[in-house]
Amino acid sequence: MSPMDLQESAAALVRQLGERVEDRRGFGFMSPAIYDTAWVSMISKTIDDQKTWLFAECFQYILSHQLEDGGWAMYASEIDAILNTSASLLSLKRHLSNPYQITSITQEDLSARINRAQNALQKLLNEWNVDSTLHVGFEILVPALLRYLEDEGIAFAFSGRERLLEIEKQKLSKFKAQYLYLPIKVTALHSLEAFIGAIEFDKVSHHKVSGAFMASPSSTAAYMMHATQWDDECEDYLRHVIAHASGKGSGGVPSAFPSTIFESVWPLSTLLKVGYDLNSAPFIEKIRSYLHDAYIAEKGILGFTPFVGADADDTATTILVLNLLNQPVSVDAMLKEFEEEHHFKTYSQERNPSFSANCNVLLALLYSQEPSLYSAQIEKAIRFLYKQFTDSEMDVRDKWNLSPYYSWMLMTQAITRLTTLQKTSKLSTLRDDSISKGLISLLFRIASTVVKDQKPGGSWGTRASKEETAYAVLILTYAFYLDEVTESLRHDIKIAIENGCSFLSERTMQSDSEWLWVEKVTYKSEVLSEAYILAALKRAADLPDENAEAAPVINGISTNGFEHTDRINGKLKVNGTNGTNGSHETNGINGTHEIEQINGVNGTNGHSDVPHDTNGWVEEPTAINETNGHYVNGTNHETPLTNGISNGDSVSVHTDHSDSYYQRSDWTADEEQILLGPFDYLESLPGKNMRSQLIQSFNTWLKVPTESLDVIIKVISMLHTASLLIDDIQDQSILRRGQPVAHSIFGTAQAMNSGNYVYFLALREVQKLQNPKAISIYVDSLIDLHRGQGMELFWRDSLMCPTEEQYLDMVANKTGGLFCLAIQLMQAEATIQVDFIPLVRLLGIIFQICDDYLNLKSTAYTDNKGLCEDLTEGKFSFPIIHSIRSNPGNRQLINILKQKPREDDIKRYALSYMESTNSFEYTRGVVRKLKTEAIDTIQGLEKHGLEENIGIRKILARMSLEL
C-alpha cells in the first residue's frame, strides 16, 4: 500500500467506528461465542399459555456447529472447547427434556448428539492442564457448569478436578455472592450464570444497564431464566445482539456486547501512536466527544462500554487516546482506583495481575501532559513489567491476549517512549540504573528473538496469523532505531520487516483477524486486527531507505539525517502546508505530548515559549487565523473556523436602538423579591433539615469537592421548598410547619408561580457544576417528582385506592426522588464509583412511611399541621391503604376520605377503625423490616471497603415511629 492508501484505509476504519459510536445501544465486533450462544438458547417463555424456547435460532446455531467428535470449537485454547462443549451439552440436555416447539431435530438424533458431546467433554477434561489456563472467570464457570450437568444426571471425574476446586475456592475466598446485591459494580456481574442457586436473581436487577448485566449475553440469559418477573428490556437486548452483533442474525452471540469503548480506543490508540493523522478523518470528532463525555460521566475511570464497571485497561487507553487527540484529561482518578503497592490492578478482585494492563497504564502515564509528575508510578510499572520478563525468562503470558508478541509489542512501545522522554529531558532517569540498562538489553533480546521466530513465508505465530505478524513487525520497527542494535542485526530486522509486510499485503481467503483475544472464551475482532495491520504497514513504510545514513531519533521517528525537523524521512513539510492553523512549522512534534507520528498538526511544534493553554495557536488581536478545519486550542469544545467565521456561532450585527420607542429594562432586585416572596416565607420557617443531613452523611463516602457540594445542598433546598409550595396548593393545606401556608398569604397564583420559578433557578445552579450529566439527572428527577405527585393526586381525586406496590412506586418517584436527586448529583461529582441509589430509595420509602404513620398518630404533627391532615386532604397514605384493602367490603374509611373531614370526632373514628384492621401494627412491622434491610445494606457497603458511616445510621435512627 502507498502512504496515501494507508491513510485512506485508516480514515475508513475511523469512519466505520464513528458511524456507529452514537448508537444508543453501542456497537461491538467480537466474534460469536458458542458458550454464550448456548446460554441464550436455554431461555424459555410462556406465550399464549404455551412454553416456548425463546431463541430457537441460537439452539440451531449450536446444532450446526457441533463437531464430528461431538464437541464444540477450540478457538485457540483448551478452555474454549471445555466451556463451549459444557454449555452446549447442558442446552442439548434441557432441550431433550423439554422439546417445546422445536421439531427440527428428533429425540433420537438429540440423544445421540448428547452421548457424543458427553464423550468429547470427558476427553477434554482428562487432557486439561488446569494451572495453565488464563481465561477470565474459568475458575467459577467450569465448576458451576459441572454442577448443572450433574443436576441433569451427567457427572464427570477427571484428574484436575480437585485442583480446579482449589482455584475456585481461592477465587471466592474474598467474595460472597451476596455482594451482588449491593450497589457496587463487581466483575462477577459479567458471569451471573455461575451463581445459579446461590443468589436471588431478583435482588440484582438494579445492576441492569440497557437491558444487560455487564454487557454479557450469558449473564443476562441467566437472569432471564431465574428472575421471578419477566424482563422485556432484557429480551429486547438479546434480540438486538442476535440481529446486530457479529453473528448478524445467524443465532450466534459474542461474549460481550456492546464493547463500544474498548473497540474504539484500541484501534485509535494503535493508529495514533504510529503517526496516522486522524484529526481530519471523518467522524473523529464524534468519537473524541463520545470518549470525553464518557470520561466525564464516569469520573475518569471507564470500562469496555459505558457504566459496566471500570477497569485499568480501558481507562488507561481512553486517556491515552484523548491525550493524543489533543483532548487532555487527568490520570489522577485512574491512579486512585487501580494503583497497588507494586503494580496496577485491572479490576478490584482479580486473581493475578495483567501484564498488558500495566503496559497500558504505563503508556497512558508516558503520554500524559506532564509525565514527570508521575515518575514514581512510571517507575513502579516499569519495575513490575521488567520483573515479569526476567522472572519468566521472557515467557510472559498475558490474561487478555494469547500472543506473546502482543505483550512484547506493548513493552517495546513503552521502552521506546520512556527512552525518548529521558533523552529530551521530559522525564528523569530511573533511580535504578540497572533497570534502565536492562530495558535496552531486553528490547535487544526481544528484537533478536522476533527475527529468529519469523516463518519462511514472512509470517509469525503458530497459525501464520496476520494480526500476530503485525505485532511482530511493530516490535521490529521500534527496535530498528536502537543505538545498541548492530548493523548486522539492523539489516536482518529490515529484511524481516519487508518479508512481514509482504505477507501482510497478500490477499488471501483467510480472515485477517485471529483468535487471540481473551474473554470467557477466546475471540477475534476485525477492527482490532485491521488497526494493527495498518499500524505495522505505516511504521514499516516510514523506515529510512537501506542506503540512508542512520539517523537520530525524534519521538521514535527517524529524521533521516535532515538537520531540521520540518523534513521527516526526506519529505518537506506536512500535509502540503507551510503554516498550519497559525503556526510557523508543521513538523508534527507536539510540544505537550510528543506524539510518535510524522504528520500530526495539532501540537506546539516544540516551541516552549508558547503558552500550553493555546497548544501553540496564536491569534491576532483583530483577525481570526484560518484553521483549515482544525480546532483552536486543541479541544472538542471549540468550533472550526471557516473563512474566518466560526461554524457554530451566529454572526451578530450591531444596530443602534437608542431612538427606539421601547428598550428592555434590567431585572431588578425588588422585582426578584416579589417573585420569591412565597418561597422566602416558607424558607424562613424551620424544618427538619433531613435532606441536608442526608447529603452530609453520604459525603462521608463520596467526598464531593466543597464547591460542588455547596451547589448541591442549595439546589436540593430550593427544590424541596418549591415543591412544598406547590404541594400545599394541590393538597389544600392550611398549615405548614405550624404556620399558615404560603398561598393563604400571597395567593394561590403567586405561590404557584414562585414555586415554578424556583425550579428554573435551581436548574441554573445545577449548571454551575459544568457537568452535562448533572443537567440530565436534574431534569429526570423533576419528571419523576411530577409523576409521583400526579399519581397521588389522581388517586385522591378519583377516590381510587392504590395497591401497596403502586404506592411505594409513587413514593420512590416523589419523596425518594428528591433524596435520589441529591445523591445522584453527588455521584456525578465524585470519583468513587459506587451506586448508592438503591440504599437512598430505601431510605426515602422508610422516611415517607414513618411520615404517614406520624401524620395520623403524632401530637407534634397535630400542632404543626392539624389532626390527621392526610384524612382532611383525602390522601391515600400507607396505613390508610392497608386498612382499606384489609376489608374491601367495608366502605367506611374510603367514604370518610371522600368527605375530607375537618371534624376531629370523625377523624378519631377513622383512627379507631384503622386500629381494628391492625394497620398501625402492620406499618410498624414494615418499617422494622425495611430498616433491617437498610442496616444490612449499610454494613455490606462498609464491609466492601467503605468507611463506617455513623451519620447515615443516625439518620436511619431518626426515622422513627416513636410519638
UniProtKB/Swiss-Prot annotation:
Positions with a binding annotation for isopentenyl diphosphate: K688, R691, H720, R737
Record field: compositional bias (Polar residues): 627-648
Reaction catalyzed: isopentenyl diphosphate + (2E,6E)-farnesyl diphosphate = (2E,6E,10E)-geranylgeranyl diphosphate + diphosphate; (2E,6E,10E)-geranylgeranyl diphosphate = (+)-copalyl diphosphate
Cofactor note: Binds 4 Mg(2+) ions per subunit.
Binding site for dimethylallyl diphosphate: R736, K814, T815, Q848, N855, K865, K875
One Pfam family, short name: polyprenyl_synt
Region of interest (Disordered), ranges: 627-657
Binding-site residues for Mg(2+) 3, renumbered to this chain: D727, D731
Record motif DDXXD 2, residues: 851-855
Residue span of motif DXDD: 311-314
UniProt binding sites for Mg(2+) 4: D727, D731
Region (Linker): 540-659
Comment on protein domains: The bifunctional copalyl diphosphate synthase is composed of an N-terminal type II terpene cyclase (TC) catalytic domain and a C-terminal prenyltransferase (PT) catalytic domain which are separated by a linker region. The conserved DXDD and DDXXD motifs are important for the catalytic activity, presumably through binding to Mg(2+).
The family this protein is said to belong to: In the N-terminal section; belongs to the terpene synthase family. In the C-terminal section; belongs to the FPP/GGPP synthase family.
Protein name: Copalyl diphosphate synthase
Lineage: Eukaryota, Fungi, Dikarya, Ascomycota, Pezizomycotina
